[in-house]
Amino acid sequence: MRMAGQDNIFAAPIEKLGDFTFDQKVAEVFPDMIQRSVPGYSNIISAIGMLAERFAKPHSKIYDLGCSLGAATLSMRRSIQQEGCEIIAVDNSAAMVERCRLHIDAYRSDTPVQVVEADIRNIDIADASVVVLNFTLQFLVPEDRQMLLEKIYAGLRPGGILILSEKYIFDDEQAHELLINLHHDFKRANGYSELEISQKRSAIENVMRPDSIDTHKKRLTEIGFSSTEVWFQCFNFGSMFAIK
C-alpha cells in the first residue's frame, strides 16, 4: 500500500467535471483531503473515541457507517474498555474498504473490527450501544435519511448513542454566506487554490446536500431520541449526539 499523498485532485483545470466520488484517487489522498477541508476534523475523531468509551456497553455492537479509511473506528477501538464489543465498519467504496482494512490490521487490539463493503442503507443494525455517522448522512439522498435514522434508533440499546457529524446549512442568509466564506478561508490557509476550491465545490454540490441543525434535531426528536445536542461546531461543520 502506498502512503497517503497530498490532495491535488482538483489542482489542474478539469474540462468535464463529473460528480465527486470516493474512488481510488480520493482514497489515496483522503487523510490529507479531510484534514485540509473539514475544520476541527481531528478534534471530532478524538472525541468520538471519548464518547464511545463512555457509551460502549459490554458485549454490544459499535457501528461506524460510512467509515472511509477507519479513523473513527480506530479512535473508538483505542478508547473502548468494555469486554465483548465488536466494531462493524461499513463503506460502499471498494477503494476505501481495501485501505481501511490495511489501516485496521496495522494496529493490535482486543476489540475485533469487521470491515464490510456495503450500502449502509442495507446493513442490519442490532444490539448497538454506539452508532457513528461521521460526515456520511449528507451523501444520502434526502428521502433515505429518515429511514436510515429510524433503523439506527430501532437497533440501538436503550441509553445508546448516535454520533452524527455533518456540514450544515443555515436559514439566516447572511450567517450562511459568512460561514461558507470562513470555510473557504480555512481551505486557502491550508494551501488550496481558488481553482481547487471552485472545482471541488462544483463536483460535490450534486452529491452532498446538507441539512440545517434544526432539521437534524427535529428529525431525531420525532424518531424518538430523548436527548439531542450539538457538541462541536467550527464554521459550517459540526457534530451532534442523540441518545436513545
Swiss-Prot record:
Keywords: S-adenosyl-L-methionine, Transferase. It holds the Pfam family Methyltransf_25. GO terms for molecular function: carboxyl- or carbamoyltransferase activity; S-adenosyl-L-methionine binding. S-adenosyl-L-methionine binds at residues 41, 66-68, 91-92, 119-120, 134, 201. GO terms for biological process: tRNA wobble uridine modification. InterPro entries: CmoA, Methyltransf_25, SAM-dependent_MTases_sf. The keyword Transferase applies. Its EC number is 2.1.3.-. Coiled coil: none annotated. Catalyzes the conversion of S-adenosyl-L-methionine (SAM) to carboxy-S-adenosyl-L-methionine (Cx-SAM). Homodimer. This is Carboxy-S-adenosyl-L-methionine synthase. It comes from Photobacterium profundum (strain SS9).
